[in-house]
A protein has these predicted regions:
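Acyl-donor binding region in acyl/amide transferases
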Residues: 83-149, 156
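Short, flexible, glycine/charge-rich loop motifs used to bind or transfer phosphoryl groups or to couple energy/partner
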Residues: 1-2, 54-55, 111
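In a subset of proteins, long, contiguous C-terminal domains/tails are tracked
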Residues: 146-147, 152-185
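Short, solvent-exposed polar/charged micro-motifs at secondary-structure junctions
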Residues: 23-28, 131-133, 150-151
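Single conserved hydrophobic/aromatic residue that forms the stacking wall/gate
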Residues: 1-12
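A conserved beta-strand-loop-helix scaffold within acyl/acetyltransferase catalytic domains
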Residues: 10-98, 180-185
Length: 185
């Protein structure tokens, strides 16, 4: 018996690590991934072969959350586990059900972290809606080498401006936190 998803009637939740994922699980997750990219007009970078590779070479680091309805997967979230953290990366669905996104992407991840003793859950980029679920803004840094010197300088200027705007936006969002402030804050 699989546990039901909160408030989703006869939708059941399932969590599998890479070494537990069947070919059907990987194909379903890949289909959800493609669906999301097509929905937003983006080109997917990952392949089904890459998911198979992750499952084989990082069997306990790959974590997939699936929502099942009428004996078939209807949504999935692909996460990676490293150290004390679960990183949410991709989500997709071929059903539209109220609460399905939050259950699959956030609530199952939170449950997993609690069960596994992980101290952090990074649910992915974007989404002011995540604040209501207890996810506060955090800063992520990346480095890129730009070959063209003129473009590099223009991009560097833009990044400095964007950095200031992002920090201000994070300050405003943190003020809307569902958590009480403490003396340590």
């Amino acid at each position: 018996d699989q546990p039901r998803s909160r408030g989703l009637g006869d939708v059941y939740k399932r969590q599998v690590h890479g070494d537990e994922a069947s070919e059907d699980d990987l194909e379903a997750m890949y289909g959800f991934y493609l669906q999301t990219f097509h929905e937003y007009g983006n080109s997917p970078a990952l392949t089904l072969e890459f998911l198979r590779h992750l499952a084989a070479t990082m069997p306990r680091a790959l974590v997939i959350f699936l929502a099942q309805h009428e004996d078939r997967p209807v949504a999935g979230a692909l996460c990676l586990r490293g150290g004390d953290t679960l990183y949410g990366r991709y989500w997709g669905a071929d059903a539209t059900l109220a609460g399905l996104h939050f259950e699959t992407c956030y609530y199952q991840g939170i449950d997993y972290c609690l069960r596994e003793g992980l101290t952090r859950f990074e649910p992915g980029a974007q989404g002011v809606h995540k604040i209501a679920r207890g996810f506060l803004p955090s800063f992520v840094r990346s480095r890129h080498w730009i070959a063209d010197p003129d473009f590099r300088e223009a991009l560097a200027r833009w990044c400095r401006e964007e950095d200031a705007a992002v920090h201000e936006h994070a300050r405003v969002l943190a003020a809307r936190s569902p958590f009480r402030a403490t003396d340590a804050d």
